[in-house]
Amino acid sequence: MSLLTEVETYVLSIVPSGPLKAEIAQRLEDVFAGKNTDLEALMEWLKTRPILSPLTKGILGFVFTLTVTSERGLQRRRFVQNALNGNGDPNNMDRAVKLYRKLKREITFHGAKEVALSYSTGALASCMGLIYNRMGTVTTEVAFGLVCATCEQIADSQHRSHRQIVTTTNPLIRHENRMVLASTTAKAMEQMAGSSEQAAERMEVASQARQMVQAMRTIGTHPSSSAGLKDDLLENLQAYQKRMGVQIQRFK
């Protein structure tokens, strides 16, 4: 799983199901693909979204700011700063400073995420606030590790009563990951389509898959409902690749 796919998975796992979730997923995809580089418009859109908690808005604002690199000099937004202040608790700020010093020594996404997971959500949010307010700097990869650790903490607290102790984290994150991977696979199918008769068939399958993912995000579904979605798509893609003589490994 690529870094941006992982970030998208974790961030979407804390967004409540509904039309807004599908909209946010599309915004994230566009930002990560470099198709949306207007940070000011993105932030204004995010600020006025209903339903989302201030912390979720803060995390999304932080991710948008990290990703739209050409706009890093833009003025910081108050709604993000307020969300990432650790509820104004000085203990959170103290822990955030300690975490920041540890993160400065990390160079990988997974290393940063591992370190961050031992801190509370308030301390993690405060640490994001330090970075957002330019009081500290880390690599984008390390910052994304911090984001995903925060989302995992939030998702865990939302689903603690249902949590299964398995290596692939909680059901909500697994569910979101299947949908993100299904979307990614559908995109790959569309890019490979060409102009043959089979290509039209594959385009149709990919289009249906994208619509299904959007519908699942909009209406909300049980975490187990997406289990077969990615596998069905991968099977279709691999069958198509065999027919076209394309290497399969690339999309596993």
Curated annotation (Swiss-Prot):
Domain of life according to the entry: Viruses
Membrane topology: Peripheral membrane protein
Region feature Membrane-binding, mapped onto this chain: 1-164
Gene Ontology biological-process entries: viral budding from plasma membrane
Subcellular location: Virion membrane; Host nucleus
Keyword RNA-binding in annotation: yes
GO molecular function, one term: structural constituent of virion
S-S bridge residues: none
UniProt motif (Nuclear localization signal) ranges: 101-105
Keywords: Host nucleus, Membrane, RNA-binding, Viral matrix protein, Virion
InterPro entries from the UniProt entry: Flu_matrix_M1, Flu_matrix_M1_C, Flu_matrix_M1_N, Flu_matrix_M1_N_sub1, Flu_matrix_M1_N_sub2, INFV_M1
GO cellular component: host cell nucleus; membrane; virion membrane
Span list, region RNP-binding: 165-252
The family this protein is said to belong to: Belongs to the influenza viruses Matrix protein M1 family.
Function: Plays critical roles in virus replication, from virus entry and uncoating to assembly and budding of the virus particle. M1 binding to ribonucleocapsids (RNPs) in nucleus seems to inhibit viral transcription. Interaction of viral NEP with M1-RNP is thought to promote nuclear export of the complex, which is targeted to the virion assembly site at the apical plasma membrane in polarized epithelial cells. Interactions with NA and HA may bring M1, a non-raft-associated protein, into lipid rafts. Forms a continuous shell on the inner side of the lipid bilayer in virion, where it binds the RNP.
Subunit structure, interactors included: Homodimer and homomultimer. Interacts with NEP. Binds ribonucleocapsid by both interacting with genomic RNA and NP protein. May interact with HA and NA. Cannot bind NP without genomic RNA.
Additional notes on this entry: Most abundant protein in virion. When expressed alone can form virus-like particles in transfected cells.
Protein name: Matrix protein 1
Annotated organism of origin: Influenza A virus (strain A/Duck/Czechoslovakia/1956 H4N6)
